[in-house]
Amino acid sequence: MIIGIGSDLIDIRRVAKVIERHGDRFLNRVFTEIERAKAERRATNEKMVVSTYAKRFAAKEACAKALGTGIRQGVWWRDMGVVNLQAGQPSMMLTGGALKRLQLLTPPGLEVRIDVSLTDDWPLAQAFVIISAAAAGKL
């Protein structure tokens, strides 16, 4: 069963301007340590760094929409983090208010799966998030 679907489209140049203006203050407020490390591994190409941050920002927006809250009601930026599963595909790791909200939405006895799709084509980045639940072992 689908619990929530969210999508977001963002102009990468907008993220670049915010990073230029606010720097580490913005990065530390919005992104998890894992997300910052992923972006900084691409430090040889500034466009790739900014694109990496923009896709993750879009994923957070999409996830907040899938949770039905937006960035409010106790759900904050760093409560949602893009992580890569062992095979490489992106997913979301939720903590804090985002995890509490997900637990409220999940029917008892069901297991949650969060599917994430990220893409960019300069100057745009896009993310889709689908939160689903099924009986254990059925996802």
Swiss-Prot record:
Q: GO cellular component annotations, sorted alphabetically?
A: cytoplasm
Q: Name one GO molecular function term.
A: magnesium ion binding
Q: Where does Mg(2+) bind?
A: D8, E61
Please list the reactions this protein catalyses: apo-[ACP] + CoA = holo-[ACP] + adenosine 3',5'-bisphosphate + H(+)
Q: Which domain of life is it from?
A: Bacteria
Biological process per Gene Ontology, one example term: fatty acid biosynthetic process
Q: Where are the transmembrane segments?
A: none
What Pfam families does this protein's entry cite?
ACPS
Cofactors (names): Mg(2+)
Keywords of the record: Cytoplasm, Fatty acid biosynthesis, Fatty acid metabolism, Lipid biosynthesis, Lipid metabolism, Magnesium, Metal-binding, Transferase
Q: Does the entry feature the keyword Metal-binding, yes or no?
A: yes
Q: Where in the cell is it found?
A: Cytoplasm
Question: Which enzyme class, named as a word?
Answer: transferase
EC numbers on record: 2.7.8.7
Cystine residue pairs: none
InterPro entries assigned:
4-PPantetheinyl_Trfase_dom, 4-PPantetheinyl_Trfase_dom_sf, ACPS, Ppantetheine-prot_Trfase_dom
The reply to whether Transferase figures as a keyword in the UniProt entry is: yes
Family label: Belongs to the P-Pant transferase superfamily. AcpS family.
Its function? Transfers the 4'-phosphopantetheine moiety from coenzyme A to a Ser of acyl-carrier-protein.
Q: What is the protein name for this chain?
A: Holo-[acyl-carrier-protein] synthase
